[in-house]
Amino acid sequence: MDQDKYLSSYDYHLPADCIAQTPAVPRDHSRLLVVKDPFTVDHQHFYDLGNYLKPGDLLVLNDTKVMPARLHGQKENGVAVEILLLTECTENQWIALVKPGKRLKLGAKVKFPARDGEKPDLWATILQRDDATGGRLLEFVLEPGQRLWDVLPDYGEIPFPPYIGDRQATNDQYQTIYAEKLGAVAAPTAGLHFTEELFTKLAQQGVQTAKVTLHVGIGTFRPVEAENILDHVMHQEWIDVPPTTVEVIEKTRASGGRIFAVGTTVVRCLEGMAQESDFPRQPLQPFRGQTDLFIYPGYQWRLVDGLITNFHLPKSSLLMLVSALISRPRLMAIYETAIAKGYRFYSFGDAMVILPEACRGQEKIR
């Protein structure tokens, strides 16, 4: 079997001190590993990004915003409970991951105190198990006409990834500066490096931006477990590629500009939209809905020319996605170099930009 299909081929050892616990300050002072071509990398800082972009290039951003999805409460008998909200089903019913799951029986009532200690407790009842996520369906007690969204900031906190042990960073540092649409349980971390000053500089250079939405879900962190990655069942995520973004993409392509996805979530949006449109056989169409697109080596690209991304966890579907762009052996060699040179990994870590010239040999559908 081709080595690209083995899960173990995407494993690597990462020393614990390479996992960033705090973000760079300012944001764009993180390091930037530039994959220039199939053989060459540069070592720069994120504020140098413009040196590798051309007038007419397009950066596509994910404007999702991390919601205060983690709530701490207790059962009626005083046992501590923690939940992570995943999906809104109705105005007052949500699917959530719960701890301790085995001790939260159906019908159990949980109260969540307000963060300020002044507002009344928020109550919820465990209705049923959700087999798809391993979580539970909860029904919250709200005022008539009220949604949980309305009160969530009073009771919830931003969920930081589990590999960030000592929470020294602020909530704002775990949001992109262009975050608008509340709904994610994790940040689209490739976008955390951008500052207003950098956007201004890039705009003056003739680099454009456009936005899509993908609310990052818990599926992003679920490990791939099948040794043959072709047996992996990819999680679904809701995406929105609006007409205005499709229009900018078409103009960029027509003028010879290059399309850079800022993060793997944007890759899923753009390639998912292109797949739904049957592009390039048919014109691009705006798309809003679910995608379960799984990108791994051998994938035939439709739209994305280049990628800005962070450094990802071993054996993750995100590592497979990036491997599909520049090949797995090349990516794993780059990761070895990054570790040796002290790059910081994961959500608050450094970034890499993969230029179109580095993607030669990764054929697009014609």
Curated annotation (Swiss-Prot):
GO terms for cellular component: cytoplasm. GO terms for biological process: queuosine biosynthetic process; tRNA wobble guanine modification. Its EC number is 2.4.99.17. It is found in: Cytoplasm. SUPFAM superfamilies: QueA-like. It is an enzyme of class 2 (transferase). Gene3D superfamilies: QueA-like. Pathway: tRNA modification; tRNA-queuosine biosynthesis. GO terms for molecular function: S-adenosylmethionine:tRNA ribosyltransferase-isomerase activity. Keywords: Cytoplasm, Queuosine biosynthesis, S-adenosyl-L-methionine, Transferase. Its main location: cytoplasm. It catalyses: 7-aminomethyl-7-carbaguanosine(34) in tRNA + S-adenosyl-L-methionine = epoxyqueuosine(34) in tRNA + adenine + L-methionine + 2 H(+). This is S-adenosylmethionine:tRNA ribosyltransferase-isomerase. The lineage of its organism: Bacteria, Bacillati, Cyanobacteriota, Cyanophyceae, Synechococcales.
